[in-house]
């Protein structure tokens, strides 16, 4: 028995997708007679047509579990884009440069010169080596 029409109508009446509409197999004959929206509403109330619960996000995804390096698929830059990587590096370098200036390891003139060429350093340790601790 084709109940496609009833299923579509039930989905529209309930405001849900087709996948969330379940027709009770024991009451198929009752559902097949339904033609109007009112009939469908009555069948939903009686339980012949059931609206399934919305699927949620699994607990493991909610709390960011299973996101370690072994679970990651995709390229190096799809996980941490170049821009994010750059931001992380440059912020660390600027933080270190500011700290050096505050501790008196470099003066204001050196600070400005180094700030301008920070992009040429790959890491904080490289910056420290250049300043010559």
Swiss-Prot record:
Any GO BP annotation: translation
Disordered, as annotated region: 55-83
Gene3D superfamilies: 1.10.1200.240, 1.10.1650.10
Record keywords: Ribonucleoprotein, Ribosomal protein, RNA-binding, rRNA-binding
GO cellular component: cytosolic large ribosomal subunit
Biased composition (Basic residues): 60-83
Role summary: Binds to the 23S rRNA.
UniProt similarity note: Belongs to the eukaryotic ribosomal protein eL19 family.
Name this polypeptide is given: Large ribosomal subunit protein eL19
The species this protein was found in: Korarchaeum cryptofilum (strain OPF8)
Gene: rpl19e
